[in-house]
Amino acid sequence: MKNAIVPFVFACCLLISVDLAHAQGFLKVDGKKIVNEKGENVLLRGIGLGGWMLQEPYMFELSDAAGTQTEIKAKITALIGQKNCDEFYRFFLTNMITEKDVDALKKWGFNSLRLPMHYNLYTLPIDKEPLKGQNTWLEPGFKLTDNLLSWCKKNKMYLILDLHATPGGQGNDRPIADIDTLKPRLWESEANQQKTIALWKKLAERYKDEEWIGGYDLINETNYKLEGNESLKKLFSEISAEIRKVDMKHIIFIEGNQFANDYTGLTPPWDKNIVYSFHKYWNPTTIETIQKYLDMREKYNVPLWMGESGENTNEWFRDAVKLFENNNIGWSWWTIKKIGSESSLMTISKPAGYQKIVDFWTGKGPKPTVEEAKATFMDLAEKVKFENCKINNEVMDALLGKK
């Protein structure tokens, strides 16, 4: 009987969930719910900004050519030179996510964004620091984040910061964290862990008074053998403690090991403003598949957030969103834009010379000239703009119930 009642109760909560156009104040934890400062239930409906600060090869049809973003950049540099590569990336980062994207997302019905951050836009790798143990802060990442936040504030949308690629990398899946296997991982290096802690404190200092920052998603999808998750719990606790020295208000989102699914050793919550964030891919959309998270919510009186899902059919999307919302679980979908894919919210069209470059990189064709290759990459930096992307209305319909 209890399992039958719970979805009904949460469905009733949705009927009184706040309209964010009139919401005020920081998000916070209230028992099993995420609420605003008026105590109104807030159901997050969001999109992950994948491919912007961190380019996973598959999102650009480059899986056969490169394993990580670093490898992509190295190949581009070898083809067109460092100066041209830097120019391309400046335009790409400027154009991939703009105010037009955020305005449209708000208009369509989304109320939040999840920003997958690459640490190297904010600080130097440990082996490039002028002094060992020093943290050199870089302007590009902070400026991009500031701009994005200003667009979110204008649209009254929450922005959740997600450290997608940590110093050293948090797992064995190389593409999602831009991992160099010749360098120490996050879990093998105290210096990388200290830089991660310092970065989160720096972010918290910068955004502590920003009510449209929805919270801090500390580490994306750890996937590493950690006995009892003790090292993960230790690092989460240390990051949380440093954040709380400067910011007592924002939610801290905690993902489990094994791609945000294993919470061994990560309960009970050690902070009064923690939300547990699970991810869901490639399994049925039945309540049984999320029951362990519902049980965790019930046992520890803590909210849940489904921080990442996607890469499936529109029918699956629709059923998954229904499952989450019937159980008062906010969500963030993956992802906003990809090349040649209709499972993302928008599709980036492939530049005319793009396949020639891919063929060269995969040993299937001749090398393009510097001029040809640079023109192709600069065209890509134009094609990622909102106004040049194809909107996949079927995906939007599946997520938001539009007609």
Regions found by a protein language model. Give the residues of each.
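N-terminal module-boundary/linker segments of secreted carbohydrate-active enzymes
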Residues: 23-46
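Generic structural signal for residues positioned in beta-strands
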Residues: 33, 46-48, 275, 330
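Bacterial Sec-dependent N-terminal signal peptides
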Residues: 1-24
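Active-site mouth of glycoside hydrolases
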Residues: 38-44, 49-251, 256-264
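Extracellular glycoside hydrolase catalytic/binding regions
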Residues: 26, 188-339, 343-362
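Extended, alpha-helix-rich binding/interface surfaces that flank or overlap catalytic cores
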Residues: 330-332, 337-403
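A general structural signal for short secondary-structure junctions and capping/turn motifs
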Residues: 2, 37, 321-325
